[in-house]
């Protein structure tokens, strides 16, 4: 009986690990900002980012997981067979910095990053202390490149605005 319980526990843990934790929620974006962001300047930056990203993507801001504000969605399938959905562009107003989630591996994206302004970067995120530290037109270009790249490779809800 004990071995069966251990196997069942292991199976549940493996299933939980395989599930994508960053999924759309019904949590209100405004309520999240009020509850999660205690710095008024960061809250103002977050509201400005929401306004810009909604305009740039044509999508309404939506909560993804407990702390990511995403715009649009796309479906991905890895070679391993793991599949899921993710926001096309997103950000999280964390304590240390605004964390931006945009695809940055195209040539245009790399050129924009070189001139974006003051930020730090990890493999998948751009960290910005204040929106005033970066060029918003270059951030727009990064968002457009994300939409372009993702819509070429995945089923994507976002469309580039018509010129």
What do the PLM-derived regions correspond to, one by one?
Residues 2-163:
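Charge-dense, helix-prone N-terminal extensions
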């Amino acid at each position: 009986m004990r071995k069966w319980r251990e196997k069942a526990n292991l199976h549940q843990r493996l299933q939980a690990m395989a599930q994508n934790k960053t999924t759309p929620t019904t949590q209100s974006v405004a309520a999240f900002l009020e509850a999660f962001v205690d710095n008024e300047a960061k809250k103002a930056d977050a509201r400005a980012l929401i306004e810009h990203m909604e305009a740039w993507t044509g999508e309404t801001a939506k909560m993804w997981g407990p702390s990511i504000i995403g715009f649009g969605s796309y479906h991905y399938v890895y070679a391993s067979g793991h599949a899921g959905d993710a926001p096309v562009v997103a950000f999280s107003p964390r304590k240390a910095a605004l964390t931006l989630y945009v695809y940055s591996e195209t040539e245009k994206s790399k050129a924009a990053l070189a001139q974006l302004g003051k930020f730090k970067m990890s493999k998948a995120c751009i960290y910005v202390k204040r929106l005033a530290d970066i060029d918003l037109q270059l951030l727009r270009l990064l968002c457009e490149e994300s939409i372009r790249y993702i819509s070429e490779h995945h089923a994507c809800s976002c469309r580039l605005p018509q010129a």
